[in-house]
């Protein structure tokens, strides 16, 4: 999940999406890539990492949305992910919408 200047939203987004990761189980992770935010986005991610062991926060220089998504895909592939689902950190996609994709994965 790419994140840029989402300090005000990222906590809510984590709280919404983390139960999806827990429900899937196994080696599932919620990976958020901070794209060089100038606000407290990464600090918020780190705060939530203390609460959620399956949350991975990655801080990196700004590369823009596309570059950050690509970096996230590379991270997931290198980590051996069987499935990758990408959504943005602005809260526009709701976790309930995920399950229709998950059911079609086979």
Residue map of PLM features:
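Structured catalytic core of nucleotide-sugar glycosyltransferases
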Residues: 1-106
């Amino acid at each position: 999940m790419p994140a840029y200047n989402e300090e005000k939203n990222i906590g809510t987004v984590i709280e919404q999406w983390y139960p999806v990761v827990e429900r899937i189980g196994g080696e599932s992770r919620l990976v958020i890539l901070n794209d060089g935010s100038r606000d407290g986005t990464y600090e918020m991610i780190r705060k939530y990492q203390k609460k959620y062991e399956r949350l991975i926060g990655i801080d990196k220089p700004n590369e823009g949305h596309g570059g950050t998504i690509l970096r996230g895909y590379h991270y997931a592939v290198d980590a051996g992910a069987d499935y990758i689902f990408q959504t943005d950190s602005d809260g526009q996609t709701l976790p309930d919408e995920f399950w229709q994709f998950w059911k079609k994965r086979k």
